[in-house]
Every structure is written in C-alpha cells, then in structure tokens.
C-alpha cells in the first residue's frame, strides 16, 4: 500500500474537508476581515481611514475647513471679498464693483435649462408611474388620467402611449379602465 491510502485508513478527517473550511485565499481573507470588524466594534467601518472615505469627505466638503471653502468659492466665481471682479488665475482686480440682480425666478429658470429632460425621459417616467398605479388594486383612475395628460409629443406618440397602457390594463384585468381609456383614445383621434 501507498502512504496516502494508509493515511486515509488511519485518519480520514485529513483527506475530507469540513463544509466550513476552505483553503482559498478569498475565504481566509473574508475570515480575517470579519475578525477585524468584530475587534473594531459595531460603530466603526472598515474604510474609515481609506482613500475612498477621504474622497467622499472632499466631495461633501466635510474635510475642507470653512476658510478654505470660502476662498475656493471666491476663486470659482471670480469675485474677491470686496466684490471686485478678478481674473481666474490671479488676485488682481479686473474692473469696478460688480452687482448681481438675480431673482428667485431667474435661478429656477437656469436650473431647468441646465438639466432639461427629453420627451422620451419624461414619457418613460410617466409610463413607469402609470404601470405602478395600474398594478395597485383598488386605485381610483383620476390620478392615472392626470398622468396621461402629462404625456408629451405629437398625437402619434400619445396614441402609442395610450395603446400600451390599454394593453397593460387588460393584462391586469382592469376591464372598466380599458373602456375608459378607449373612449379617451377615440376623443384624442
């Protein structure tokens, strides 16, 4: 007999692995990390001092002192503390005093203009909400009809949208709602 077979006959536990034991490095690494997590305590995280957490702090502004944050904002806008316009790379003033006359409406208009949604995105969002409302049992249909009024685009797009919602309502066994949708579709055409 060979040495291996004698060893199996004498001590079978050395050959067969236990279900929780594994020799792979990833298993051992997970075990060590779990042990470290228990040692650190429940409130501490494993990435507390890592570069990732520092980057998150920089993004949120928690790691930047307020004095540096103010100077960074001033550098970004091009204004100094005395409201003189400056060149972005230098501290020399360019012109006289600059005043701003923005109202709340101007800011709202700029926000909507900076991130406009396309008709497809708006319609896809409405469709997702409509399907969610359709699947809720016992819902009133007024809310769904209000959402359907918000569909944007030409009549062909609206017609396709109504047809897809009719199919979804039929699939959800909403026969009375399908009748109402078909009436609205006929009025629209």
From Swiss-Prot:
Annotated region described as Disordered, given as residue ranges: 1-27, 83-118
Record's compositionally biased regions (Basic and acidic residues): 1-23
Tissue expression per record: Testis specific. Expressed in cancer cell lines.
Keyword Protein biosynthesis: no
Record Pfam families: INT_SG_DDX_CT_C
Entry similarity comment: Belongs to the CT45 family.
The protein, known as: Cancer/testis antigen family 45 member A1
Organism listed in the record: Homo sapiens
